[in-house]
Amino acid sequence: MKNPVGIISMQFIRPFTSESLHFLKKSRALGFDFIELLVPEPEDGLDAAEVRRICEGEGLGLVLAARVNLQRSIASEEAAARAGGRDYLKYCIEAAEALGATIVGGPLYGEPLVFAGRPPFPWTAEQIATRAARTVEGLAEVAPLAASAGKVFGLEPLNRFETDIVNTTAQAIEVVDAVGSPGLGVMLDTFHMNMEERSIPDAIRATGARLVHFQANENHRGFPGTGTMDWTAIARALGQAGYAGPVSLEPFRRDDERVALPIAHWRAPHEDEDEKLRAGLGLIRSAITLAEVTH
């Protein structure tokens, strides 16, 4: 079974509002099987029913990406922020139901990046352990709710320059196993794995059945095939892990402060990128097919 391949909505625009609905049809026209949409904020004014109608009509699947922050962090020292984090993750379940999505992925626990306005702060080992325990506690509360609704959260490790607690695949596995709910799995992103893992294929195989979402990104966050990633080995590892779920492309390329600031990305091109997207999609699909026929 071939994995569905999708594109993140930030490739086109952010925020994604009711004025952005034409990008759903564009994603399908480019050949993608699904779109990875940021969980809409109430102020975005997105009509969930209309999004669902268009996606169903186009045969376009939907995956959601959570947006945590300082005010909604289940790892926070502040009780109000922890409550905000739990409430937000519960809202993500509701949004997934309204939009017709099953997977909600992301770091989930909040407070990533100094670039997003968080002042640098040297966590001690004890503080990080406490934050990790709070993360497990918070996810243990919301993951069963997701499972009951037929949804699943994907906990994404981010590299050491962007967050704490979960930087590696092994750390994500540890949290997921500690929670022990079918409503929580692991989400992997090759951009971050390229910095943190000694072997990306080995990390994928170690994740195994815990893997619920996968992002195929180059080492420089550009289009697949323009960097150093060994897509054949990565696709083969996905097959060996028994992963048949969605594979999303996430090239952060927009000249937009709402994208650039949180990820410290300053070099966005100004040309039409549709052909690069098609080529990247074709490369990932070919790698998956090759892995299947040579397995």
UniProtKB/Swiss-Prot annotation:
UniProt subunit comment: Homodimer.
Chain positions recorded as substrate binding sites: E162, D189, T190, F191, H192, R221
Protein name per Swiss-Prot or TrEMBL: D-tagatose 3-epimerase
Influence of pH: Optimum pH is 9. The enzyme is stable from 8 to 10.
Keywords: Isomerase, Manganese, Metal-binding
Purpose: Catalyzes the epimerization of various ketoses at the C(3) position. It is able to interconvert D-tagatose and D-fructose to D-sorbose and D-psicose, respectively. The enzyme is also able to accept other ketopentoses such as D-ribulose and D-xylulose with lower efficiency.
Required cofactor names: Mn(2+)
Chemical reaction(s) catalysed: keto-D-tagatose = keto-D-sorbose; D-allulose = keto-D-fructose; D-ribulose = D-xylulose
GO MF entries: isomerase activity; metal ion binding
Chain segments annotated as transmembrane: none
Pfam families per record: AP_endonuc_2 (PF01261)
Binding annotation for Mn(2+): E156, D189, E250
Catalytic residue list: E156 (proton donor/acceptor), E250 (proton donor/acceptor)
Temperature dependence: Optimum temperature is around 40 degrees Celsius. The enzyme is stable below 40 degrees Celsius, but decreases with increasing temperature.
EC number(s) reported in the record: 5.1.3.31
Annotated source species: Cereibacter sphaeroides
Family from the record: Belongs to the hyi family.
Entries under InterPro entries matching the protein: IolE/XylAMocC-like (IPR050312), Xyl_isomerase-like_sf (IPR036237), Xyl_isomerase-like_TIM-brl (IPR013022)
